Regions:
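Short, well-ordered alpha-helical segments
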Residues: 70, 84-131, 207-257
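Intrinsic disorder/low-complexity detector
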Residues: 2-100, 142-219, 260-305
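Short, well-structured alpha-helical patches and their helix-loop capping segments
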Residues: 103, 107, 138-144
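Short, conserved loop-to-beta-strand elements that form functional interface hotspots
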Residues: 126-138, 245-257, 263-278, 285-286
Length: 305
C-alpha cells in the first residue's frame, strides 16, 4: 500500500467516524452497525438469537422467523438538578428529581429507537425477548446508561407495521398470549426518581427510640410516591397505544444515600441528608385481537390488532 493509499484510507475512516458521531447525535445507530445489519439481511448467513430451543419452536409455529440479535444503547449525561426551595425544612421533603428522571427517559427512548432501527434494517416486524440493562447513575459522575437487546423476527403472512414492535415477552409467553386471543402492542417503560429527606420529628423519634423496630414513614411515603409516578406514566403510555392492559410488569428499585450542603438561599446553613429513590417499571402492553382464535395458530399471528 502506497502512502497515498494509506492517507486516503485514513481520510475515509475519519469521515465515516464523523458521520457515525453525527448519526448518534441525531438518535440513530452508527454507520458501521447499519452496514453490518444490511449485509446480514442480504447475505443469507445463519441467524443468531437469544431464543431457547423451545422458544424458537413455538415462534416458528406462530410464523415468526428469527433474523438476528439486535441492540440499542444510550449513555446520557445528567444535568444540574436543583432541589425545590423550602422555607420549612423541619417538615421534611419528598420531591421528584425531574432532571435525573428526564435523563433516564431520554436514554431509554434513544435505546428503544436504536433497537427498532436495527430491527428495521433486518426487515423485522417485531423484536421479542427484549432485555433491559440499566446502569444506576453515579451522583458524582453524572451519567446514566441504558442498553436493550432482543431477537428481531419477521412475521409470515402479515403486513409489516411502520416500526417493529418491541416486547419483553419470551417465545412461550408470546405463544400463550396468542392462544388467549391477545396480541402485543409494544413495550412500555417509565422511570421515577425521588429525593426523600426525613423531617426533624422523624429524626428525633429515631434518636429517642433507636433501640426498637419502627417504620420510617417519610421513606415509606417516598417509595409510594415514586411508584405512583412510574405506574401512572406506564398506564398513560398503554392508553396512548390503545392497549387493553399491560402484562409482565416488573418494578426495580434502587436507593442511594446522599448528603448536601444547605445554603443561605434556602433558609440556613448546614448539611441535609436523605435517600434518592430510583424506581424503574416496564412491561408489554397488549390488546385483544378482533377475532380470538384459540386453536393452534397457522402462521397467521397478527401484531397489535
Amino acid at each position: 500500500m502506497t502512502d497515498a493509499d494509506r492517507d486516503a484510507s485514513a481520510e475515509t475512516r475519519e469521515r465515516e467516524q464523523a458521520e457515525s458521531l453525527a448519526r448518534i447525535e441525531s438518535g440513530r445507530i452508527p454507520l458501521q452497525a447499519e452496514r453490518r445489519l444490511r449485509e446480514m439481511a442480504t447475505s443469507g448467513a445463519p441467524f443468531s438469537s437469544t431464543l431457547s430451543v423451545d422458544e424458537f419452536a413455538l415462534c416458528s409455529k406462530l410464523g415468526l422467523q428469527p433474523l438476528g440479535q439486535v441492540l440499542g444503547a444510550s449513555v446520557h449525561q445528567v444535568g444540574w438538578q436543583n432541589l425545590p426551595w423550602s422555607s420549612s425544612w423541619g417538615g421534611g421533603l419528598i420531591c421528584e428529581l425531574d432532571v435525573i428522571a428526564g435523563a433516564w427517559e431520554e436514554a431509554r427512548r434513544r435505546a428503544f429507537d436504536r433497537l427498532a432501527e436495527e430491527a428495521s434494517h433486518l426487515g423485522a416486524d417485531v423484536v421479542v425477548g427484549v432485555r433491559l440493562h440499566r446502569g444506576a447513575h453515579d451522583w458524582a459522575a453524572g451519567a446514566v446508561d441504558y442498553v436493550v437487546n432482543g431477537t428481531a423476527a419477521r412475521l409470515s403472512g402479515s403486513a409489516r407495521p411502520g416500526r417493529p414492535l418491541l416486547s419483553d415477552l419470551s417465545g412461550q409467553e408470546v405463544w400463550l398470549l396468542h392462544q388467549a386471543g391477545y396480541a402485543p402492542v409494544g413495550l412500555v417503560a417509565a422511570t421515577a426518581v425521588f429525593f426523600v429527606s426525613p423531617s426533624y420529628s422523624t429524626q428525633w423519634a429515631r434518636y429517642m427510640t433507636s433501640a426498637v423496630n419502627q417504620e420510617l414513614t417519610d421513606f415509606t411515603q417516598g417509595v409510594y410516591a415514586a411508584r405512583e409516578s412510574a405506574l401512572g406514566s406506564l398506564t398513560g403510555q398503554a392508553n396512548a397505544n390503545g392497549a387493553d392492559g399491560i402484562v409482565g410488569v416488573r418494578i426495580e428499585q434502587a436507593t442511594a444515600f446522599h448528603s448536601f450542603s444547605v445554603g443561605s438561599s434556602i433558609g440556613g446553613r448546614g448539611d441535609r441528608q436523605g435517600l434518592i429513590i430510583t424506581l424503574q417499571a416496564f412491561g408489554t402492553a397488549i390488546r385483544q385481537r378482533e377475532r380470538a382464535d384459540l386453536s393452534p395458530p397457522r402462521a397467521n399471528m397478527e401484531l397489535g390488532r
